[in-house]
Amino acid sequence: QYNLHFINTPIELSPAVGKTPPIVDKYGLIYVIDEEMAEVKADPKKAFPLVIRANVYDCVDVLLSSEWDDDDFTNFQMSKVNIHPHFFQFDNQASDGVITGFSYDQSMRSYTQFTKKMKDGHHVSMPIPMNAKLLKATKPGDKTIEIKMAPHSPTYHVGADIIVGIEVPNGKDARWITNISPDPNKGEAKDGKYKITFSEGMTHAHAADQIVTTEYVRYRWWVDADVGLVFWHDHAFGATTWPHGGIGSTIVEPWGSTYHDPETGELIRSGPVADIHGTEPFAYSRNGSFRELVAQLHDTVPHTAQLVTAGNPPGLTRENAIAAGQSISFQMPSDMLEVAFPHLNGGTHTTGGGFNFRAASLASRLANNKDSSKLFSSKVHGEPSTPMLRAYVGDNIVFRLLHGMQNETHTFVVSGHGYRPERYDKDSRVTNALHIGIAERYDLATTAGGYQSMAGDYLYYDGRTSKLSEGEWGIIRVHDKKQKDLKVLPGNENFAKKAKKVLCPKGAPVKSFSVVAIDKELNFNANTEGEIEVDFERKLLLANAAGKIYALEGEAKQAAADGHMPHPLTLRVNIGDCVKVKLTNRLKSGNASFHANNIAFDPLKSQGINVGNNPGDQTVAPGKSK
């Protein structure tokens, strides 16, 4: 049973970073669980798209109500909301969310709205929602209530089902009306006051002024199979609600599972990070308990969008660049930052990315500290605001991946860890990078510590350059020692014995390479000019005078020669080889590093990225080798 509310509340997508202020969507629109609503409203840091869970064979009962009052600016003077799930079995006439053909209306308006803009004696657009307030307190067992309808609201009728105390967490009563006095069929009461009798007594006590309403919908979902992540969203005003958080996920867990806070072990009802305790299979050759991270990646969130400068018309002002992409449902802030990657080309702005409406903007971090080699360092910038998954070496992990919205495609990459895109198929190719389109979802199982079974901080991220700049990345923190604030996962009590300290096994063949990083002017197409005008003086850039490449030491002179167009460096090794790379930085400026993503490496020495709390510096300064 989930009692859900759709609320209008601020969302903090990113905290302040140095002098860069926090990124806050003041008009957040999200679903919350009844008992968590007050806490979420009080703290924008706790507001994000909802994640709830159900087990295989559960019948899920959802009661949805809304506090989103009519908004004359963005939604045609009338706010309605619903839930449309993508993968469950449900009655399409009553639990689809979408009102198709002769199906019932499965959406609702706000139960908090008691006034409406008036013009020439009439309300503007839709009338007041069917809301009322209790005139007198009631006791458990009472079958009658006295109410006063909102001014200009339509009146209830016999046979309708209404809710008393809808705003009270776990304290509401839904009842059928058997009698109304005075009879509204003979004319509405001038003072709006009515006495209502129900078919049965109420369960809870109710105070005077509590809200009485018809503005709610009850859905029922049948979870008959392990379908993993199920995407759902508002289907009434999606273009308005989605960019502000109006989406959610229900995770279908194995039969008999329980859901726990990783730090305390307590049972939880919602949230993107959870420990799932159980005994059933959840992927090929995997069963039992696992750590879970729900990664709802997205675009089309105006607050994390960034300005693109390369290839745009000379003299294009910030104001004009922002105005070129503004719309009623996509209101970008006037103080948005420029992208962290100056050679990013195409359009005047990015589209605003993140995970679970959280973004660790690289542009903000660069503004705070210009050393790009420290971009992902928690010791320099603090922890990212995106969800962090913590685990012990050998723990089972499942990434519940969703492209929640709305216009682009993405790639999901996990550093040092592999997964099968089809989790129950033993022949599904193990990879660490996955392309994902709009509304697609995957359930990706892996083992903490990855191919190398080593502790350390690893990255997960969106491989699109624009999304990475906006802050679509996070950390997987793997421990090999017991932590006070991280419970041990059932079935992996001996995790310390699984942790390796040495990467290559004794006797493994060694293959060595000497690689240099050099500056090289690049022309990506010898048959075209370096830039092509697309429209209105916007240019597609097909050359990079400030290019940087890798080359083998013995081939560096040829690669750097004028007129030579090198290919990206390819190194070949055999299965079972221990690969050693000496990297020399011959760039004029800036550190260099070498990150090989989908093979085993020591995350503390050879990841090539300074991630989280990992020690030392894994990059190479100009003129130095490592």
Name the predicted role of every residue range.
Residues 54, 154-158, 206, 231, ...:
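Short, well-ordered loop/turn sites that connect or cap secondary structure elements
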Residues 246-286, 438, 468-510:
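Extracytoplasmic/periplasmic copper-protein system
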Residues 405-408, 412-430, 466, 478-482:
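Active/binding-pocket-proximal capping segment
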